[in-house]
Amino acid sequence: EIGSGLVGSEMCIRDRCATITPNKQRMEEYPQLTQMWKSPNGTIRSILDGTVFRAPILIDSIHPVVKNWKKPITIARHAYGDVYKSVDMYTTEPGECTMTFRGESGEEKTLLVQKVDGPAVWQGAHNKEKSIRSFARSCFQYAIDTKQDLWFATKDTISKKYDHTFKDIFQEIYENEYQEKFKELGIEYFYTLIDDAVARVMKAKGGFIWACKNYDGDVMSDMVSSAFGSLAMMTSVLVSPAGVYEYEAAHGTVQRHYYKHLKGEETSTNSVATIFAWTGALRKRGELDKLPELCAFADKLEKATLDTIESGRMTKDLALITELTDVTVLNSQDFIKAIRKTMEK
C-alpha cells in the first residue's frame, strides 16, 4: 500500500478500490497476514495528504430522508492525522501517563495526561500545521470552484490547543487569501462548533461544503450519504496539495455481499459509486490531457447509470427507498448489463 501511495503521487490521477483493515477476525481469516496492519486506506491518505471530498449522487426518484434537503451536501474530510495516525495502549496497573515532546534543539515539553488507580486505555494523536494549511486551502479553493458556501466545525471550546489550531488556521487563511474572492462570488465561510453544525445541517437545504476533521468527516459522510439515499450513491475524491486526484467508492468492501458471493449465492450489490469513481478519474484524465472524447465517455456512462435507475431497473438497496412503483430488482451482474444496454441505445 505504501508503494501504491507513492505511485499515485507520480501519476496524478488514480482510482482506488476498497481495502481491508486487519482486526482479530481478519487475522484468523487470512493467516498470511503477518501482523494487524494499520488501515491501508489511511496509509495511502497519509502519504498523499490533502482533502477527501464526498458528495451524494442525486436522482429524482429517491428523496432524502431529511425532507428539507434539496441540494447536495459535500463533505470535505481532512485526509491526514488525528486518530488515524494515533498510537494507543492498554495498561493494567495504577500509575500515570505523560506526554513528552523532544525538540531537535534538545528542549523538552512534558504534560501529565492523567493519573489512574487501575486499568486504563491511552491514545496519542497528532496533526501537522502544514497539513492543516493544505486542508484549509483545498476547502476554500473547492468552494470557489463550485461556488458554494463553506462550513467548518471543530470542538475548540474543549480542545483549546488541538482543535483551536484548526480554527485559527482556517480563519487566518480565509482572511488573508480568500475573503475577497468569496465576497465577489457571493459565497460565505462559516465556522461553528461541531455539535451546532450537526443541528444546523439537519435544518439546512443543502448546497454547501461541510469541512470536517478526519474522524468527523469519516462519520458525517456516511450519515449524509445514507440520509440522501445510500452510501453506494456517493462520489469520493482525494485531492492532494501536489495535484494528485484519487477517486474511490465512498463505501468499503461490502463484506456481507462478498461472503454470499463466495458461497455461490446471488447478490444485488449497488455498483454506482464504483462506476462514478472510474468516470471521475477518466474525466479528470481527459481534462488534463485535453481529450474531450474521454470526458464525453465519462459523462455518457454516468447518464446511462442514472437513466437505468430512473427507468425502474436497480439494485435491492435502491428498490427499498425509491419513489417509483414499477421497479425491477436486478442482481449485481444484471444491473451492470442493464447500464450497458442503456448506454448502447
What are these regions (language model features)?
Residues E1-G8, I13:
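Single conserved hydrophobic/aromatic residue that forms the stacking wall/gate
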Residues A18-P22, Y30-A120:
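Flexible glycine-/small-residue-enriched beta->alpha junction loops
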Residues M99-T192:
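Glycine-rich phosphate/diphosphate-binding loop of Rossmann-like nucleotide-binding domains
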Residues T146-T154, Y178-Y191, G286-A298, T308-L320:
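Flexible, glycine/charged-enriched surface loops at secondary-structure junctions
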Residues T192-A199:
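Short acidic loop-to-helix transition motifs that present clustered carboxylates
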Residues V201-K300, A304-S311:
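Glycine-rich phosphate/nucleotide-binding loop
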Residues K316, L320-K345:
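Phosphate-binding loop/pocket of nucleotide- and phosphate-handling active sites
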